[in-house]
Design a protein with these regions (language model features):
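Rossmann-fold cofactor-recognition segment
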Residues: 47-60
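Rossmann-fold NAD(P)-binding glycine/threonine-rich loop
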Residues: 101-123
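C-terminal catalytic/substrate-binding lobe primarily of soluble NAD(P)-dependent oxidoreductases
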Residues: 145-289
């Protein structure tokens, strides 16, 4: 059997784990799920003949290396900043690796080493980034195959809740790492091309500069710019495009409300507020007023 190691058993990994477990018998896969919480790892594997859950501390070099060495493919569902040590282990032991995260400079720097060993390091293969890339290229290739020319490209994606579960004022729920939601949009200005002109939106204005779209059967949504769209211009083969824009979808009103947190400085994680875990929401907000 082929051995797949999944590191991280949090919210983002749930669907992946269930999918691979369902496929494990037919595809002859043995799934090892490693997490700092043994309970989290084993909640999927108890009683399953083709899976096991283990306690795996990614900061423990011996534990991490042993788990990687005993696998054929490693899927890291860790926060993006922790992928790099796993990637180095995969190169050391000659293992393929998959993540759902954007390619960091540190990960890109390992490209030649991975290629030299004949390894596949596949990143940006989740929902966003991931499915958006694949659906984009499917549409672009279809247009080109028919002799069409791309003048404008806009791609919208977002982790939205099902209408029947939409029962709070934010019209939003955490389905992935909450920290990543809080930090969304940070790390540099959003960059894109609009009608032949380069545009930049700094973080402090990101959630105030939105546009609206209508999705048939589901209603009106808003979109804010998603990171640096320009880096995909050559990857998508859109060198002569007049508009290139990738956006994140939210329900109408989300961005305006979230912008209040941004302007108050509540999304800044560069400092720690002592005893904040024991404060009421009112007390915490009052710190910034």
């Amino acid at each position: 059997m082929r051995n797949i190691l999944i590191i991280g058993a949090g919210r983002s990994a749930t669907s992946l784990i269930r999918y691979l477990l369902d496929k494990s018998e037919k595809e002859e896969l043995f799934i090892t799920i490693g997490d700092i919480s043994i309970q989290a790892a084993q909640r999927f594997t108890t009683g399953h003949p083709n899976a096991r859950g283990i306690m795996l501390d990614v900061f423990n070099d011996v534990q991490r290396k042993e788990a990687v060495e005993n696998s054929d493919l490693v899927i890291s569902m860790l926060p993006a900043r922790y992928h790099i040590e796993v990637a180095k282990d995969c190169i050391e032991f000659g293992k393929h690796m998959v993540t759902a995260s954007y390619i960091s400079k540190e990960m890109q720097a390992l490209n030649h080493k991975a290629q030299a060993k004949g390894l596949v390091f596949m990143n940006e293969i989740g929902l966003d980034p991931g499915i958006d890339h694949m659906s984009a290229m499917q549409v672009i290739d279809r247009i080109r195959a028919k002799g069409g020319k791309m003048l404008l490209f806009e791609s919208f994606c977002g982790g939205l809740i099902a209408p029947e579960s939409d029962n709070n004022l934010w019209n939003y729920k955490f389905t992935w790492n909450p920290r990543n939601v809080v930090l969304a949009g940070q790390g540099g200005a959003a960059e894109f091309i609009q009608e032949g002109k380069y545009k930049y939106i700094p973080y402090h204005r990101l959630f105030r500069r939105t546009e609206f779209i209508n999705i048939e059967g589901y209603g009106k949504f808003e979109v804010y710019a998603n990171r640096n769209s320009l880096q995909y211009q050559s990857i998508y083969g859109l060198e002569n495009i007049l508009t290139l824009y990738r956006g994140t979808i939210r329900r109408v009103g989300f961005s305006r409300a979230w912008n209040m947190f941004v302007q108050l400085g509540m999304t800044d994680d560069s400092y720690t507020i002592p005893d904040s875990e024991n404060m009421s929401y009112r007390e915490f907000v009052n710190l910034f007023l």
